[in-house]
Amino acid sequence: MPKFKQRRRKLKAKAERLFKKKEASHFQSKLITPPPPPPSPERVGISSIDISQSRSWLTSSWNFNFPNIRDAIKLWTNRVWSIYSWCQNCITQSLEVLKDTIFPSRICHRELYSVKQQFCILESKLCKLQEALKTISESSSCPSCGQTCHMSGKLTNVPACVLITPGDSKAVLPPTLPQPASHFPPPPPPPPLPPPPPPLAPVLLRKPSLAKALQAGPLKKDGPMQITVKDLLTVKLKKTQSLDEKRKLIPSPKARNPLVTVSDLQHVTLKPNSKVLSTRVTNVLITPGKSQMDLRKLLRKVDVERSPGGTPLTNKENMETGTGLTPVMTQALRRKFQLAHPRSPTPTLPLSTSSFDEQN
């Protein structure tokens, strides 16, 4: 907002200056010398110079400009354009804020983009520093002489805080500002880099003499943890059981004793039922799906007048409701017949030889 107000003030001041200039020019154009008096009627001949002067005066009077209207139009257009740009900026800012509130990932994307840009800048700077270090190492490898190296003139603006790589850890950087040769002598070149260490040979355990020779050698602590011959020789092994011993301890399934033998089965004695139900009770009261149990324990003797068949007599009169067998009676008779004549008689209970009529 302050930038926008400052810009609007500048535009207003510029428009006022232009307006004042136009007014001054218009006022000066009005102060023109008056035209010469018209010729007298006595003169008959008119010179060409007078005609041209009169025509020029007429053209100058007809060339009338409207600077005020143009300046006003420009001023209003500038104001409208500034208001339009201000509204557009406000709308875009509000939309950006709304988008950031609805989608918070946009902020993360912007931050990530800025971090990427910074990373690219740092990477480019690092590449430049690595190139500078390479050139310094090349210049240090030249033989030392009384004069400075020919490459030192190209590296006067090397920064002091340089990220040193592992390979160039011992390289000494020159100072940032070149020293004048009159006050101090040129600095000596840095010492050459040490040669890289040779690769380690693989450890081979073929003979005890080689193992002892390797055991006496020094160990490097800089690298990762290594298993030496001494560690292998000091390892103690525990005695384990072989497969044959384990098989002897675990008996085979054939050698196991059987859980139930024939003699055990022969010594088993079955107890007979103390109270065997009569054929009439088993044939009539017990259904094939139920277990055979003595129902006389659950019954209680009651003094009730009974019919010869055993059913209790009631006060209701036995009235015949119809002739013939009903479906319920046929089902009851069929069930009674099946109970009296089972298909697979049990060996414990004797077969009933009495007929269906005798049982009734």
From Swiss-Prot:
The keyword Ubl conjugation applies. Residues 20-43, 174-201, 340-360 are annotated as: Disordered. Coiled coil: none annotated. The modification Phosphoserine is found at residues 40, 291, 344. A motif (Phosphodegron) lies at residues 285-291, 325-330. The modification Phosphothreonine is found at residues 33, 287, 346, 348. A motif (KEN box) lies at residues 316-318. Ubiquitinated. Rapidly degraded by the proteasome; degradation may involve FBXW7-specific phosphorylated phosphodegron motifs. GO terms for biological process: regulation of cell cycle. A motif (D-box) lies at residues 296-304. Plays a critical role in cell cycle progression. This is Proline-rich protein 11.
